[in-house]
Design a protein with these regions (language model features):
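Acidic two-metal-ion nuclease catalytic site recognized across multiple nuclease folds
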Residues: 248, 252
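Conserved residues in the N-terminal Rossmann fold of short-chain dehydrogenase/reductase
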Residues: 66-68
Length: 268
């Protein structure tokens, strides 16, 4: 498992340079709400993000809230904005949708192209209702997050892929990006870099996927990659966790960044 994680981490660094976006880091006291479906409801990737902040910035408390519900589409999310999401009083709101919105079984039916177009138009119409609500939140920073992919290419036993489903998802991600630009919101994409990692490793192992045994729900490795990509968009990749320099003769810290050095003793 450790070796696999190291390999995936290396793949992240080589596969994501072209997909990097800019999301402002969270600030002290902020309330970060992640709105989404079952992938968010699982509670992993945003808890990893929170853990990063807690361990790297222990004196800068933030609150992270899980706003995911399994099976949700943009239509469902819009219906629960007031009673659920806005009730959490977000200062930053991450918005992810598309997996359920894009549909499933009909992609293997007689008219997959027509079905994909229908679900795309339906999803955009539903999202636009949320977009209107978000515009009325002057004190809330909106971050559009392109969803993790539906993995059509992994070879899984007894699991026939819904061909071109992820193409519909990618169109929705592109619309999210355009919406963010139009409204001066922030945007980052999980779909493209995770797809690139999947396809890179599937060249050697066709059964490899970050998207779980159902092609939809990322496993723990997948959630760790999602957290990495989000933190990368916030500008943290490559930054030192802590840095210190000690003068042994003087028994004192010459340099201490993001850490505290005390009780220095010299032997010999």
């Amino acid at each position: 498992m450790k070796k696999l994680f190291v390999l995936i981490a290396a793949a992240c660094m080589t596969c994501t340079a072209a997909f990097a976006q800019t999301v402002k880091p969270f600030k002290e006291g902020e309330r970060a709400v992640f709105l989404g479906n079952s992938i968010t409801d699982a509670g992993h990737y945003h808890s990893y993000i929170w853990l990063y902040y807690m361990t790297r910035f222990p004196d800068m408390p933030i609150r992270v809230f899980n706003g995911g519900i399994g099976g949700d589409t943009a239509y469902d999310m819009n219906k629960r904005l007031d009673g659920d999401i806005f009730a959490m009083k977000p200062s930053v709101l991450m918005v992810t949708f598309g997996m359920n919105d894009s549909g499933y079984f009909e992609y293997n039916g007689d008219k997959p192209k027509e079905f994909g177009e229908q679900k795309y138009q339906e999803s955009i119409k539903n999202y636009q209702q949320m977009e209107k609500r978000f515009k009325d939140l002057p004190d809330t920073r909106i971050v559009m997050v392109g969803t993790s992919p539906y993995d059509e290419t992994v070879q899984l036993k007894e699991n026939t892929p819904f061909k071109t489903k992820n193409e519909t998802i990618k169109r929705l991600v592109e619309y999210q990006k355009e919406s963010a630009a139009k409204n001066n919101w922030e945007f980052t994409d999980l779909n493209a870099p995770m797809t690139a990692i999947n396809q890179q490793y599937q060249q050697k192992d066709p059964t490899f996927t970050l998207c779980g045994s159902d092609r939809i729900h990322p496993d723990n490795d997948g959630h760790m990659v999602m957290a990495y990509l989000f933190l990368k968009a916030q500008g943290f990749v490559g930054k030192e966790v802590a840095d210190m320099e000690i003068n042994a003769n003087k028994k004192q810290a010459v340099k201490s960044e993001n850490c505290t050095v005390s009780n220095i003793k010299k032997n010999g």
